[in-house]
Every structure is written in structure tokens, then in C-alpha cells.
Amino acid sequence: MVELQVRDATAGDLAAAGAAWSKLQEFHRSLGLAFPLPEDAAQKWLDSFQRTLGRFSFLWVMGPTIQVSAFLLARVKQSPAFLGAVQVGEISDLHVDESLRGSGAGTLLVDAAMHKFQELGMHSVEVQVQAGNDAGLQFWRKQGFHQELALVRKLLKD
């Protein structure tokens, strides 16, 4: 049995994390994700957090460098003033390769994020789950999360 280890991502992990993120988006699109993804979506995703890594965004991975088999991206954000202007942790992306599902890899990644958020004194942590991802919703409930909001969307263009 292979020992699962969570580690901070390095520059050498970014391309593999971007490829894993693309797989995650393919899954989300199969469930009905309404946003179009440009050809360079993975690079734009990486660009969205690289400069804030270690301060307001955190990327943990599993697997050897350049061969990421699981990752979690977490971000720090602030609620609006009318909601107390508190700092909130956001787990924006979690992907575990099919070969590791059921191994506890996802839970280990979530534990790393929760530890960081507790260390930073976050008010709460939120996660968005794509509609139709029942297994994902069940996973988050097992992690102690509960449903608070439901997002609805109407497309204005075809």
C-alpha cells in the first residue's frame, strides 16, 4: 500500500495541477457547467492564484512532482461588510484521480486546508458543489459541511 502524503505544491507541480484541473472541469461540464472554457482555461486558472500562493491562496498536491494525482486549491476571501466583513476560507477546487478514490486522499487534502484556515483564524469555510455531483456532496457532508445556499442560473445567450 502506498503512503499518501500531502505537500505544498511547487513550481514543478503547476502544469500537472493544471492538467488535473482540466479533467475536473470536463467532469463538471458533463454535469451541466454552464460556463464556456477557453482553450487556455487551465493556464488562466493557474494565473488566477499563482501570485498570491502562500498568502491568500494555497495549493496542496499528492504524487511526485510533474505527476499530480490529487490536488486542493484553497483561497481566503472576505465577506461583505453587511455580512460582518469576516474572513472566509474557500475550497475552490478538489480533484482526486480515480486511482486514489476511496483511499482517504481527499480527506487528507481537506484536513490540510482546514488546518491552514484554523491557523489563519477564518470565520468559516465554504465549498461550491456542481449540481448533480451527488458523490461530491456526500463527501463534503462527511467532512462536516452542511448545505446553506442553493445557486440557480439562467443563461441569457445560447
Identify what each model region corresponds to.
Residues 107, 131-149:
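Conserved active-site alpha-helix within GNAT-family acetyltransferase domains
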Residues 61, 67-76, 90, 95:
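Conserved beta-strand in the GNAT
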